[in-house]
């Protein structure tokens, strides 16, 4: 058994992979958004010289719950659901189609990095253009709240208000602030994620080949949880600094703010050291496993329900 591959029928079959990807995105936000809110607040306030410093992710989460309730943890979720549904649909669909194209007539004798990596990076590059504006809105909504340092006159009433005000103040290019950091994060992150996922999935299924546990929804779900979760941890461990830079760039209200992610990280390192470049590591890693596990389980289950055969 080689790397995971999909086989669809004629007609609507081509689009089924994109539908399955959309379901993966919805599952990701439902499970992971509260952790993401904590991560963004830590990245915004714990890297600012004059920022409110939270002791850790748990302290940040407790402050949000005390001042805003559970609703505060899902601040900005509307744009996340919309963005992630579309983004995941594109990511999983493009990744699957790119693999089919690059594999061609090559023998299916195991995962091939020369197929997985470019397929994942290509998908990551495409979705970065979708993610950049939606994540800018999400991040700006997330840093607001009772416990925020954002002045009241700079706050937004809704995701739509945030998008409109951003375009009004900064022009159309303003909504794509942080595009370079998003591109770096998505290309690198997806290459790491799918490489770990494919190799783990291949080796686990290889060991179960002659086992009675080979088939079954619970077995497939368990493998999906493990491979997706570990892939998510590997991905975010590799790209968190790019994500920190993206958050700083996107949440700044100043037009003249530095937008080169490497220069932003250099500045953060001077102020807060390596720890500053990994601000939000705790909630990010805690979120990475369940959120990405949910994405893979939802993706694989949806494909099975849609009649997409996977080897």
Swiss-Prot record:
This is Mitochondrial arginine transporter BAC1. Keywords: Membrane, Mitochondrion, Mitochondrion inner membrane, Repeat, Transmembrane, Transmembrane helix, Transport. One of its GO terms (cellular component) is mitochondrial inner membrane. PROSITE patterns: SOLCAR. The chain crosses the membrane at residues 18-38, 76-96, 113-133, 178-197, 222-242, 288-308. It comes from Arabidopsis thaliana (Mouse-ear cress). One of its GO terms (molecular function) is L-lysine transmembrane transporter activity. The gene is BAC1. Optimum pH is 7.0-9.0.
């Amino acid at each position: 058994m080689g790397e995971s591959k999909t086989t669809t029928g004629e007609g609507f079959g081509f689009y089924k992979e994109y539908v399955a990807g959309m379901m993966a995105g919805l599952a990701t936000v439902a499970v992971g958004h509260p952790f993401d809110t904590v991560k963004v607040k830590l990245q915004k306030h714990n890297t600012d010289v004059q920022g409110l410093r939270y002791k850790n992710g748990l302290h940040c989460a407790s402050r949000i719950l005390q001042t805003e309730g559970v609703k505060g943890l899902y601040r900005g979720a509307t744009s996340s659901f919309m963005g992630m549904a579309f983004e995941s649909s594109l990511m999983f669909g493009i990744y699957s189609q790119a693999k089919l194209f690059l594999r061609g007539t090559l023998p299916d004798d195991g995962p091939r990095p020369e197929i997985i990596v470019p397929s994942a990076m290509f998908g990551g590059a495409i979705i970065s253009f979708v993610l950049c504006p939606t994540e800018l809105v999400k991040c700006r909504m997330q840093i607001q709240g009772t416990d925020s340092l954002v002045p009241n006159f700079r706050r937004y009433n809704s995701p739509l208000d945030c998008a409109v005000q951003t375009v009004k103040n900064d022009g159309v290019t303003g909504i794509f602030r942080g595009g370079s950091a998003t591109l770096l994060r998505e290309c690198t992150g997806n290459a790491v994620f799918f490489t770990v996922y494919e190799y783990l999935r291949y080796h686990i299924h290889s060991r179960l080949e002659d086992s009675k546990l080979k088939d079954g929804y619970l077995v497939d779900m368990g493998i999906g949880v493990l491979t997706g979760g570990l892939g998510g941890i590997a991905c975010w461990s590799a790209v968190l600094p790019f994500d920190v830079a993206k958050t700083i760039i996107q949440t700044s209200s100043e037009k003249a703010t530095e937008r080169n992610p490497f220069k932003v990280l250099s500045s953060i390192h001077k102020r807060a050291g390596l720890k500053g470049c990994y601000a939000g590591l705790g909630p990010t890693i805690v979120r990475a496993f369940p959120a990405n596990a949910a994405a893979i389980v939802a993706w694989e289950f949806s494909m099975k329900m849609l009649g997409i055969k996977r080897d």
